[in-house]
Amino acid sequence: MELLSRVLLWKLLLLQSSAVLSSGPSGTAAASSSLVSESVVSLAAGTQAVLRCQSPRMVWTQDRLHDRQRVVHWDLSGGPGSQRRRLVDMYSAGEQRVYEPRDRDRLLLSPSAFHDGNFSLLIRAVDRGDEGVYTCNLHHHYCHLDESLAVRLEVTEDPLLSRAYWDGEKEVLVVAHGAPALMTCINRAHVWTDRHLEEAQQVVHWDRQLPGVSHDRADRLLDLYASGERRAYGPPFLRDRVSVNTNAFARGDFSLRIDELERADEGIYSCHLHHHYCGLHERRVFHLQVTEPAFEPPARASPGNGSGHSSAPSPDPTLTRGHSIINVIVPEDHTHFFQQLGYVLATLLLFILLLITVVLATRYRHSGGCKTSDKKAGKSKGKDVNMVEFAVATRDQAPYRTEDIQLDYKNNILKERAELAHSPLPAKDVDLDKEFRKEYCK
């Protein structure tokens, strides 16, 4: 019995050396990029071209713990309808953890699994309860990788029936009851064994291939590194018009933008994504075609516009005027109405003030002339009244003056007064213009 167990163990070790879990591209396969997509883009000249190149696996998430966020776990499912349960798991920077108490010291994983790539599960003594499909699951959270391998375990009572074979989908292992069983899971890719360093692991570059030029002679346009470094190549007329987002590695969007397309920009553009640590090498190809910009044909020149046959016809404004649309915006509230009403009232008030000013100025001018006339008339009137009073006074004093005539005149003044008393009153001068002005001013 012991001899058969040793023979079975040696067979399992031989199977371990031959059964290797397939992984991502490595070695020479990693050097070549896999073509992900190829499309034709046709745009008009003068527009902006956007060549989409996106990949969530290229998002820069620096692993500060240097454990690469890797984990391996083994699961067991008893049959098609049974529920899968977790048996054991182990992180690259931690210890292995067994979930069921009965499986402790029975299920073993190699402590150096993340160094030598051997993630096989050893069961020391199998029993009937261990039958089922075992799944080896590898998860790389940093590189967004998930890989799995299934092994089916069958338990037999006859040690001579112990064997291992391939059923077309997975490995089948037949083990005698109480004998050890080794479920093989090997993956020696550097992404799981940490054989490569992290520096310069992410790089993106854009190439431009002119029509008729082979792929290996394409011109480099841009180089983008996860560290933030950027390098621009290509002809000057194109270098100033191409750009990629500054946060490309934070969003995983490396789309190329070309401003103001020209006919000389036609060609084959390729986006190359390389994540050397995670083994990502992808290529996306775009066939860019630049067409003539769409424009309206010029209208005929009218006969009376004076244009000759050699000059280009000018567009007729009446042709497009019939198809124009005039948008009239009517305010929904009464603010606009009150605003216009305020303008009208303010204008009317200014006009009234101006009219009042003119009337007052005219009245003031006329009142000044009337006062001047009144002053002159007053002086003349005063003189007339004095003369009348003086004449009346002289009449009253006539008897006395008659007596004085007989007397001897003392001086010339008395003589003149006497002559005036005996002489008739002078005619009163009447100024009709002054009288008319007095009546008008009243």
From Swiss-Prot:
Keywords: Cell adhesion, Cell junction, Cell membrane, Cell projection, Cytoplasm, Disulfide bond, Glycoprotein, Immunoglobulin domain, Membrane, Nucleus, Phosphoprotein, Repeat, Signal, Tight junction, Transmembrane, Transmembrane helix. Residues 296-319 are annotated as: Disordered. Residues 362-442 are cytoplasmic. This is Matrix remodeling-associated protein 8. A motif (RGD 2) lies at residues 251-253. Glycans are attached at residues 118, 305. It comes from Mus musculus. It comes from the Eukaryota. It is found in: Cell membrane; Cell junction, Tight junction; Cytoplasm; Cell projection, Cilium membrane. Pfam families: V-set. It is a single-pass type I membrane protein. PANTHER family: MATRIX REMODELING-ASSOCIATED PROTEIN 8 (PTHR44793:SF1).
